[in-house]
Amino acid sequence: MGVLDNKVAVVTGVGSGIGKAISLAFAKEGASLGVGDIDVNLLSKTTEEIKKNTESVNSLKTDVSSEEEVKKLIDETVNKYGKLDIIVNNVSVAIGGYPITDMSNEEWQKIIAINFSSVFYGCKHSIPFLKKNNGGSIINIASVQAHTPLPGWAAYAGIKGGVISMTKNLASEFGPFNIRANTISPGTIATEMVNQVVEEDGTGTLLDDFILMHPLGRIGKPSEIAATAVYLASDGGAFASGADFRVDGGLVITPRTRPGVGSHSKKND
């Protein structure tokens, strides 16, 4: 028996990292799943891993910057399993590490589309099904950067702060329908996205700097974010709503800004 038996969940960005960990954890706990990712090869690999725990999985290539594709993933999942209990809006792209004065409008629009509009689409098209189901759980993945400044990441942090604010408003507005809405704000997690940021930084010290920012002396694991998502998706989290769950190794309570980040010009790199 799993804590998500008889529940149906949609999870985006399952090809790797946090989204993959959440989808696998949900499958182990008995959920039926609708999963999406823009990378069909990674999506296929995750789907095969999910099937080790359950055959109840609907897999669909999904570009979360497209409202039509997000809606299709949700609709197909409901058509297959008859209802929706949980939505996890997970996809993010890391663009930053330099001042916003060096950020192109194209980069800004990309961050908005993937990190914010995707969350809006997921919530917009899942809420009618959650209402019909007499309730459910919305889980939006934000970031610890919405809580503590890190030079060079103002655009990313601002949008993640917007995700938190929108989620709190959804919790208030749709609470009367027994719909809970929460965010999870991870610290630095061992994911492909973090690996990309470290590689693009080029100093060779960024990973060590990230570790020093966390009082626990390490970066986190995707499975540790997934464990929080399982709680919020389950009946154990039935009274949790409108909250931001920081899973950050204590970073926010002891903020340590990395010297020099954001002090360089992207155009001079």
Model features per residue range: what roles?
Residues 97, 241-269:
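Short C-terminal tail/terminal secondary-structure segment
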Residues 128, 172-176, 238:
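Alpha-helical segment proximal to the catalytic Tyr-Lys
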Residues 123, 159, 167:
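Active-site helix of classical SDR
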Residues 143:
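Residue(s) in the substrate-gating loop at a strand-loop-helix junction
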Residues 8, 15-17:
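Conserved glycine-rich cofactor-binding loop
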Residues 120, 218-247, 252:
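C-terminal substrate-recognition "lid" of short-chain dehydrogenase/reductases
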Residues 98-100, 107-112, 210:
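Substrate-binding pocket helix/loop in short-chain dehydrogenase/reductase
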